[in-house]
Structures are given as C-alpha cells and as structure tokens.
C-alpha cells in the first residue's frame, strides 16, 4: 500500500513538473481582420461603337494619358516605408519635511512646602521630525525600419484610403509576422507609390513570431501561477 502511494506521488510530481513547460500566451492581435483585399468587379462593358468605353474600370482597362498611377481603388497596392523611432522619458521627485518642538515646566514641590524644601521645578521637552524624499524615473525607446507593401481595403468618403497588409518570413523553425494597417491620405503618396509610416493615421504596426525561440521567451502558466501567489 505504501509502495503504491509512493509511486502515485512520484507520478504526480513528474506530471506537475512537466506542466511547467506548457505556456499559454494570451495575446490579442493588434491588426485584426483580413490582411488583404480583392478588387471590386466593375460593370460589364457594353459595346457602343465608340473608341472610348466609359463602362470600363479606370485602373483595370482604361488608363487616362495624364493620370498618375497612385492607388485609389480597393485592391490597389501601396508600399509603406516603416520609419518609426519613438523615445520617451519621465522623471519625478518629491520632498517633504516637518519639525515640531514642545517645552513646558511645572513645580515638583507644593507651594506650602517650598519654604522648607525650596522651589524645585521640572522641565519637560518633546520634539519630533518627519522627512520624506522620493524619486522616480522611466525611459523607453523603440526603432522600427523597413518596407511593407499593403493593399487598399476601403475607400473612405473623403478620399482617404484604409490600407492593410501582412508579410510572413520563415526562418529555420520559426515564422516572423509583420502586420500593418492605417489610413493614408492620397496626397502624401510619392511618385514611386510609397508613403512613410509617420504620415499614416491610426497606424497599427505589429511584429510577432512563433516557434521554439518565441516559446522559450515566455514563462509557463504554472510558473506564472506561483509568481502571482508569491508575496515577494
């Protein structure tokens, strides 16, 4: 009976230790939804005997002679030049000081006995002080550079373009994901069909990965459980 209990205890211990390697990573994607968009089909062209066919889509059949090639329809592509360089610092300090002092005296011999024992007095003095000093500081910086070609998935009523895109790079046993979304003003698009990420409104840039390297950087769920319970 004791051998069975010891055997069960050993198996339970090994099971608990093995669970420390399991990691559940709760993460919410910063860029949600589809990361690509298909062009919208236009009306079926009808032959009218003219050289100019107005029913043809602008970018997929008819291209004006003096019109640029900037994206303006759903499904058009645009290259985002990632130029993110953000730094922030914060410091604070506080000082407080308070001092107090009290002094008073009283007779130790009753008045009717002062002629016999003399006038004896006692002095009592009390003082106190309180001092507080506090300082704090924080620094943060991040740099992100590169290029990513995105797709127009929505044309807003004011002409701005909502773009979204994703790039996947497989390296050995892991995969890196770069996702981007934001609102682009067509006036900021250069002649080479590029726009810097610093001129994109509501930009969402996400750089994540999966694989054993990413898993090794995360704490197991059981370790996190004991970490939350630890008073230290």
Curated annotation (Swiss-Prot):
Assigned GO CC terms: bacterial-type flagellum basal body, distal rod, L ring; cell outer membrane
Positions of transmembrane segments: none
Molecular-function GO terms, alphabetical: cytoskeletal motor activity
Keyword Transferase recorded: no
Membrane topology: Lipid-anchor
Pfam families: FlgH
Disulfide-bonded cysteines: none
Positions where lipid (N-palmitoyl cysteine) attaches: 22
InterPro entries, sorted: Flag_Lring (IPR000527)
Similarity-based family: Belongs to the FlgH family.
Protein role: Assembles around the rod to form the L-ring and probably protects the motor/basal body from shearing forces during rotation.
Protein name stated in the entry: Flagellar L-ring protein
């Amino acid at each position: 009976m004791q051998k069975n209990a010891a055997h069960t205890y050993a198996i339970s211990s090994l099971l608990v230790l093995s669970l420390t390697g399991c990691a559940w990573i709760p993460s919410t994607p910063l860029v949600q939804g589809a990361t690509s968009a298909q062009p919208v089909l236009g009306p079926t062209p009808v032959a009218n005997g003219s050289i100019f066919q107005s029913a043809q889509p602008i970018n997929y059949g008819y291209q004006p002679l003096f019109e640029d090639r900037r994206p303006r329809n759903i499904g058009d592509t645009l290259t985002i030049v990632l130029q993110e360089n953000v730094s922030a610092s914060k410091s604070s300090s506080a000082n407080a000081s308070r001092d107090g002092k009290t002094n008073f005296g009283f007779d130790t011999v009753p008045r009717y006995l002062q002629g016999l024992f003399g006038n004896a007095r006692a002095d009592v003095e009390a003082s106190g002080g309180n001092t507080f000093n506090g300082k704090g500081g924080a620094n943060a910086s991040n740099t992100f550079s590169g290029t990513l070609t995105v797709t127009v998935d929505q044309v807003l009523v004011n002409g701005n373009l909502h773009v979204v895109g994703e790039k996947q790079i497989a390296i050995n046993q892991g995969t890196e994901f770069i996702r981007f979304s934001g609102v682009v003003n067509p006036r900021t698009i250069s002649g080479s069909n590029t726009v810097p990420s610093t001129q994109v409104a509501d930009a969402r840039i996400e750089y994540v990965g999966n694989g054993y390297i990413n898993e090794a950087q995360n704490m197991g769920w059981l370790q996190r459980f004991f970490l939350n319970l630890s008073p230290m």
